[in-house]
UniProtKB/Swiss-Prot annotation:
Annotated positions binding [4Fe-4S] cluster: 573, 582
Keyword annotations: 4Fe-4S, Chlorophyll, Chloroplast, Chromophore, Electron transport, Iron, Iron-sulfur, Magnesium, Membrane, Metal-binding, Oxidoreductase, Photosynthesis, Photosystem I, Plastid, Thylakoid, Transmembrane, Transmembrane helix, Transport
E.C. no: 1.97.1.12
GO molecular function terms noted in the UniProt entry: 4 iron, 4 sulfur cluster binding; chlorophyll binding; electron transfer activity; magnesium ion binding; oxidoreductase activity
Function: PsaA and PsaB bind P700, the primary electron donor of photosystem I (PSI), as well as the electron acceptors A0, A1 and FX. PSI is a plastocyanin-ferredoxin oxidoreductase, converting photonic excitation into a charge separation, which transfers an electron from the donor P700 chlorophyll pair to the spectroscopically characterized acceptors A0, A1, FX, FA and FB in turn. Oxidized P700 is reduced on the lumenal side of the thylakoid membrane by plastocyanin.
Name of this protein: Photosystem I P700 chlorophyll a apoprotein A1
Coiled-coil positions: none
Compartments, record wording: Plastid, Chloroplast thylakoid membrane
InterPro entries the UniProt entry points to: PSI_PsaA, PSI_PsaA/B, PSI_PsaA/B_CS, PSI_PsaA/B_sf
Binding partners and assembly: The PsaA/B heterodimer binds the P700 chlorophyll special pair and subsequent electron acceptors. PSI consists of a core antenna complex that captures photons, and an electron transfer chain that converts photonic excitation into a charge separation. The eukaryotic PSI reaction center is composed of at least 11 subunits.
Membrane topology annotation: Multi-pass membrane protein
Residue positions binding chlorophyll a': 675
First-tier enzyme category under EC: oxidoreductase
Record organism: Olimarabidopsis pumila
């Protein structure tokens, strides 16, 4: 008789047909809430409808149902992303000068939008070179298309159609996984399987397939393009994939196939998997062979990482065990209890993810200019400035979002009864020490950083330049930053074998790289001016963190309002009869944090814009003389507040202010309009609810007189709604103003 061990049961991880598909229900506004579904009595109804439509916590308290809604919504999000991408590729296929740009990227600007001749607006179609008239784009799509090996507008058209198919597929998946086969809660909480798929699947196989595409398609096509071959003469991508001899003509070791790989003779592949560092002097971008090598290495790391966690086979790490093994000398039980928080509160999980993704986005912003990844990106100054600014704003918003969801977690998902003495509890118990120390740091940084500028303005005003903090008088050199730069500049040849240049030309040491008479990149000198503005960065970042962290740590209770958790995430004040308790909700901290985030990012992008125009961007003569756009005035002008106002804001605004009558005039209109949107926000931020309610009742009286009064009673915005509308217009107006100012300037002079 053979005794077999019992077969492991296969877990059923989906429910079939859990929720019927009902168009009648979807057609009813507010179907997710009993109160809202009744329809409007007052105009507040439309605000509540928008506030709660995606607040799945308010629809149900069942974690499984909430998880399914979030999961389904993610597919909707992906569908929109594919739709947007399809639109970008379609514009490239149908309305752009991509093929012309590809044949001469140094003299022709990228354009993918041609304005129709209505009311004379065709003036916006500027001459971008090569006889093409259109709006210059600054998204970097042309550069990424060239890097990926796209050589014709037909290929863009096919990709656009493919993206539409994927958009439809994602919409279907969102419906299918909510209405037809919805995952159970256990599936959402199986973190090891999730890590397996995300690390090995998305990141590992994703990077591997991109590396494969780069080696087999991008590298050979870019090799031909760099050599000046007409794009129409270059073989099509599938020919390189199917015909190995074609590749072997460019990279002889291809003839040997996979033999060197299996015989561990990997150096054979060093023709197309390189480790050079620095920039390709032809295109001013990173070496594409370095990039292919990088993605192959990343793929291997993530394929290994994806197999480190215990799934169906009972081998490998468990995340809960790893977390609970982490104990420091001062942390008591260590990370015990964190696993339960992160698998039962999606807000806590989202908060961590937003904080990391936001930081990563800001890191991307800094790498896009210091290690420009795509061909001819570094010399397209308008695109460089746009990419930096865009990624900085996005990163700022994501980090504020991290604080918002951390606070929502504290209010809605935190259970103090079973959280006793874990790490989070220990942080909360000494929150006063954290916040008061952080407050001291903010005061110190604010007074000292601003004080250095005020000193310089005063000395400058009194005609005492020898007493100013500057590179030519009292020097405050950023010695630590210079040491880091120097270390990196000396690194090649010492760290990685065969590396000929440092990771970025900005570190120093290397020569400058110029493409078509324009500077791509050169060593960036740091001096007193940078020291001063970096301390302003430190100040604004710390204040933003102070506001956001105070909102999180005091989200449930404070000395002022011990029962804050009962009032919820957003509330205007602690009821009538308790003065001085307004603006204390966690939501209000996010609201205030947004303004300081805007402050912080504005200083960063202003610093970047001026520094690059002054010390990096410019033209180079045949004799090798570099002429920078603003002639190196950053070091001496940016050390006073007056210098920032006079030589940056005012001097560089001339292009946008004088843009009327030119192809840049749309930026002039946007500059004006966005200032108006910004000013409009102040009406919401500086006036109270009662003022508007009085006005509304007077207007309603007039409507009653004329017998045109609506059935839905008009109401003034609530305090929280007013603040939300205010901060939205403040940020939108401010960002659009900056966008118009930057682009009109850099397109005109860059």
């Amino acid at each position: 008789m053979i005794i077999r061990s019992p077969e492991p049961e296969v877990k059923i991880l989906v429910d079939r047909d859990p929720i019927k598909t009902s168009f009648e229900e979807w057609a009813k506004p507010g179907h997710f809430s009993r109160t809202i579904a009744k329809g409007p009595d007052t105009t507040t109804w439309i605000w509540n409808l928008h506030a709660d439509a995606h607040d799945f916590d308010s629809h149900t308290s069942d974690l499984e149902e909430i998880s399914r809604k979030v999961f389904s919504a993610h597919f909707g999000q992906l569908s929109i992303i594919f739709l947007w991408l399809s639109g970008m590729y379609f514009h490239g296929a149908r309305f752009s000068n991509y093929e012309a740009w590809l044949s001469d990227p140094t003299h022709i600007g990228p354009s993918a939008q041609v304005v129709w001749p209505i009311v004379g607006q065709e003036i916006l179609n500027g001459d971008v070179g090569g006889g093409f008239r259109g709006i210059q784009i600054t998204s970097g799509f042309f550069q990424i298309w060239r890097a990926s090996g796209i050589t014709s507008e037909l290929q863009l058209y096919c990709t656009a159609i493919g993206a539409l198919v994927f958009a439809a597929l994602m919409l279907f998946a969102g419906w299918f996984h909510y209405h037809k086969a919805a995952p159970k809660l256990a599936w959402f909480q199986d973190v090891e399987s999730m890590l397996n798929h995300h690390l090995a699947g998305l990141l590992g196989l994703g990077s591997l397939s991109w590396a494969g595409h780069q080696v087999h398609v991008s590298l050979p096509i870019n090799q031909f393009l760099n050599a000046g071959v007409d794009p129409k003469e270059i073989p099509l991508p599938h020919e390189f994939i199917l015909n190995r001899d074609l590749l072997a003509q460019l990279y002889p070791s291809f003839a040997e196939g996979a033999t060197p790989f299996f015989t561990l003779n990997w150096s054979k592949y060093s023709e197309f998997l390189t480790f050079r560092g620095g920039l390709d002097p032809v295109t001013g971008g990173l070496w594409l062979t370095d990039i292919a090598h990088h993605h192959l290495a990343i793929a291997i790391l993530f394929l290994i990482a994806g197999h480190m966690y215990r799934t169906n086979w009972g081998i490998g790490h468990g995340i809960k065990d790893i977390l609970e093994a982490h104990k420091g000398p001062f942390t008591g039980q260590g990370h015990k209890g964190l696993y339960e928080i992160l698998t039962t509160s999606w807000h806590a999980q989202l908060s961590l993810n937003l904080a990391m993704l936001g930081s990563l986005t800001i890191i991307v912003a800094h790498h896009m200019y210091s290690m420009p990844p795509y061909p001819y990106l570094a010399t397209d100054y308008a695109t460089q400035l746009s990419l930096f600014t865009h990624h900085m704003w996005i990163g700022g918003f994501l980090i504020v979002g991290a604080a918002a969801h951390a606070a929502i977690f504290m209010v809605r998902d935190y259970d103090p009864t079973n959280r006793y003495n874990d790490l989070l509890d220990r942080v909360l118990r000494h929150r006063d020490a954290i916040i008061s120390h952080l407050n001291w740091v903010c005061i110190f940084l604010g007074f000292h950083s601003f004080g250095l500028y005020i000193h310089n303005d005063t000395m400058s005003a009194l005609g005492r330049p020898q007493d100013m903090f500057s590179d030519t008088a009292i020097q405050l050199q950023p010695v630590f930053a210079q040491w880091i730069q120097n270390t990196h500049a000396l690194a090649p040849g010492v760290t990685a074998p065969g590396e000929t240049a440092s990771t970025s030309l900005t570190w120093g040491g290397g020569e400058l790289v110029a493409v078509g008479g324009k500077v791509a990149l050169l060593p960036i000198p740091l001096g007193t001016a940078d020291f001063l503005v970096h301390h302003i960065h430190a100040f604004t970042i710390h204040v933003t963190v102070l506001i956001l962290l105070k909102g999180v740590l005091f989200a449930r209770s404070s000395r002022l309002i011990p029962d804050k958790a009962n009032l919820g995430f957003r509330f205007p004040c602690d009821g009538p009869g308790r003065g001085g308790t307004c603006q204390v909700s966690a939501w209000d901290h996010v609201f205030l944090g947004l303004f300081w985030m805007y402050n912080a990012i504005s200083v960063v992008i202003f610093h970047f814009s001026w520094k690059m125009q002054s010390d990096v961007w410019g033209s180079i003569s045949d004799q090798g003389v570099v002429t920078h756009i603003t002639g190196g005035n950053f070091a001496q002008s940016s050390i006073t507040i007056n210098g920032w106002l006079r030589d940056f804001l005012w001097a560089q605004a001339s292009q946008v202010i004088q843009s009327y009558g030119s192809s840049l005039s749309a930026y002039g209109l946007f500059f004006l309009g966005a200032h108006f949107v910004w000013a409009f926000s102040l009406m919401f931020l500086f006036s109270g609810r009662g003022y508007w309610q009085e006005l509304i009742e007077s207007i309603v009286w007039a409507h009653n007189k004329l017998k045109v009064a609506p059935a839905t009673q008009p109401r003034a915005l609530s305090i929280v709604q007013g603040r939300a509308v205010g901060v939205t217009h403040y940020l939108l107006g401010g960002i659009a103003t900056t966008w118009a100012f930057f682009l009109a300037r850099i397109i005109a002079v860059g």
